[in-house]
Amino acid sequence: MKALSKLKPEEGIWMVDAPKPEVGHNDLLIKIRKTAICGTDVHIYNWDEWSQNTIPVPMVVGHEYVGEVVGMGQEVRGFTIGDRVSGEGHITCGHCRNCRGGRTHLCRNTSGVGVNREGAFAEYLVIPAFNAFKIPDDISDDLASIFDPFGNAVHTALSFDLVGEDVLITGAGPIGIMAAAVCRHVGARHVVITDVNEYRLELAQKMGATRAVNVAKEKLEDVMQELGMTEGFDVGLEMSGVPSAFHSMLDTMNHGGKIAMLGIPGGEMAIDWSKVIFKGLIIKGIYGREMFETWYKMASLIQSGLDISPIITHHFSIDEFQQGFDAMRSGQSGKVILNWD
């Protein structure tokens, strides 16, 4: 089968002829229709320090996808051949305290599809049936293929009450932009998103952000004043992993504010903890999606009218995968879809 593999320990991704995966007793065999390129895939392409320390070579990569069930193990229940599915990319152990307690997203033994095990950039993917999510008929393949990053946005945004609140999002990558759309949809008042990438700030504005602020040109405090905000942001969503962005968030949070952190700093990050203490801030780390509450919320949000389709800016056939990676690496894109049909 066709597949995209991290074939060598250097910059790049390669098209290979890979063996079709075998189906275990509790597995689904999925024929891939569409995949999306994640920021993680770009890290793997670039072969940065994280990738060098994490990714086995060679390995098929990719973890954002939608496809059709074409085979299943003899123990699988609840799925039929022809079901349209996406899937949770974090494969959990089922045995640790968090898994047994129903907090599977906090499994300490998580293995990532396309990160620690064979991924979805292939004509066929095998995953445990437990990890598959049936896609409702009224949700398109395009949207279903980005449920993984959309889930990061939903999990982060819905960590705290947003109704009538003022929200600051630092980092206008695709996940931050989708989070802005979620915040507005569920009833936040002002949703301000910051970055230095004009292309993505414009995209965030289209997706519902009250203000998209280029912090290289405009002060966040001036924007707050223009919006009539006198006491700071109630909720912060840190999506960038950039220390200066987090420092700015701490400066502009209201007392008693709540921060959800999804962005991963490149290394240790020093902050002024006195601001956290004296403001009484709550900081929550976010990793992945809640299994599977976030997945049901994603489907329900779209079915209730949330439109995240503008975040998808490019489509390529799988044979044009290099153009897709070039678009993602340029920073001048939203989500990039690769078509396998």
From Swiss-Prot:
Protein name from the UniProt record: L-threonine 3-dehydrogenase
Record-marked site positions (Important for catalytic activity for the proton relay mechanism but does not participate directly in the coordination of zinc atom): 148
Domain of life: Bacteria
Keyword DNA-binding: no
Residues that, per the record, bind Zn(2+) 2: 93, 96, 99, 107
Active site: 40 (charge relay system), 43 (charge relay system)
Residue positions binding Zn(2+) 1: 38, 63-64
Enzyme class: oxidoreductase
GO-annotated molecular function: L-threonine 3-dehydrogenase activity; zinc ion binding
Any one GO biological process: L-threonine catabolic process to glycine
Subcellular location: Cytoplasm
Role of this protein: Catalyzes the NAD(+)-dependent oxidation of L-threonine to 2-amino-3-ketobutyrate.
Sequence similarity: Belongs to the zinc-containing alcohol dehydrogenase family.
One Pfam family cited in the UniProt record for this chain: ADH_N
Names of required cofactors: Zn(2+)
Protein keywords: Cytoplasm, Metal-binding, NAD, Oxidoreductase, Zinc
Manner of cofactor binding, per the entry note: Binds 2 Zn(2+) ions per subunit.
Subunit architecture: Homotetramer.
Residues noted as binding NAD(+) in the record, renumbered to the chain: 175, 195, 200, 262-264, 286-287
InterPro entries cross-referenced by the UniProt entry: ADH-like_C, ADH-like_N, ADH_Zn_CS, GroES-like_sf, L-Threonine_3-DHase, NAD(P)-bd_dom_sf, PKS_ER, Zn_alcohol_dh
Keyword DNA-binding annotated: no
Signal peptide span: none
Reactions mediated catalytically: L-threonine + NAD(+) = (2S)-2-amino-3-oxobutanoate + NADH + H(+)
Naturally occurring in which organism (per UniProt): Shewanella halifaxensis (strain HAW-EB4)
Biochemical pathway: Amino-acid degradation; L-threonine degradation via oxydo-reductase pathway; glycine from L-threonine: step 1/2
GO cellular component, one term: cytoplasm
EC number: 1.1.1.103
